[in-house]
Amino acid sequence: SKVYADFTQLNELPKTQLGQSHYFEQDSEQQNIKVALKNNGDHIAFLINLKVVDKKTGELVLPIFWEDNFINLLPGEERMVCANFKGTSEAELKVEGWNLE
């Protein structure tokens, strides 16, 4: 018989607060984004997912090349993450996470 991992306790992770700032840079037909993240809470910030969407349509900007994503941050930990993508339309950052407030 197969045995599967039980990840149900992840649903019990306490909520935590994530601080973030970011900026976009246009370079001819390419855009770059730099995102500064900081876990301001007392618990791990689990599986932080960064997305860039077109501001007008709300559609995901693809392809996008992140140097890292689905990040975990311990309490007080900070991280800078960069990405680049083609296009000149106005974009915005969306930040999601397993246990973010």
Give a label for each model feature.
Residues 35-42, 87:
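Asparagine-centered strand-capping/turn motif at beta-strand->loop junctions
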Residues 52-69:
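Short beta-strand and strand-turn-strand segments in soluble, beta-rich domains
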Residues 3-38:
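Surface beta-strand/loop "capping" patches
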Residues 23-24, 67-73:
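Beta-strand-rich interaction surfaces with strong enrichment in secreted/lumenal proteins
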Residues 32-36, 49, 80-82, 94:
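Beta-strand secondary-structure signal
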Residues 43-51:
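Short, hydrophobic/aromatic beta-strand segments
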Residues 1-14, 62-66, 80-101:
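Terminal connector regions
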